[in-house]
């Protein structure tokens, strides 16, 4: 499913928790495995919003709901990366890398990994 909505941080954390749990999760599992100390009412609100936005489906399984991702983690990451690049750097990867370098955010190891990655892409 193609979903162009950008998620707020809390909803993204819920999605990351579900993605890390596998193919589906209950609200209790999300609450237990999330890195936040959320109340169940907050978790249920986030899950409901994610269903409304088309990121999750909800099916009744006995007495509980099972939430299944409709958007993969990789698809979301790729879309957000491209959007970030367009919004902040005018679509220029060079500008992004230059900004990171100027800010001192790139280590020698990062640069070596980038070179190796680019070498693999061109060969």
Can you describe what each PLM-predicted range is?
Residues 4-10, 61-80:
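Short, cationic-aromatic polyanion-contact patches
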Residues 12-17, 29, 95:
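Pre-recognition alpha-helix immediately N-terminal to the DNA-recognition helix
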Residues 44-48:
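Short, hydrophobic-biased segments on the C-terminal half of alpha helices
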């Amino acid at each position: 499913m193609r979903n162009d909505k950008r998620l707020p941080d809390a909803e993204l954390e819920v999605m990351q928790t579900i993605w890390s749990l596998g193919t589906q999760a209950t609200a209790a599992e999300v609450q237990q495995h999330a890195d936040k100390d959320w109340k169940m009412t907050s978790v249920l609100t986030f899950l409901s919003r994610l269903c409304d936005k088309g990121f999750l489906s909800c099916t009744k399984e006995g007495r509980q709901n099972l939430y299944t991702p409709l958007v993969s983690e990789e698809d979301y990451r790729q879309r957000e990366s491209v959007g970030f690049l367009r919004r902040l750097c005018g679509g220029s990867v060079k500008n992004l890398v230059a900004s990171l370098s100027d800010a001192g955010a790139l280590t020698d190891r990062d640069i070596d990994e980038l070179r190796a990655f680019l070498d693999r892409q061109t060969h």
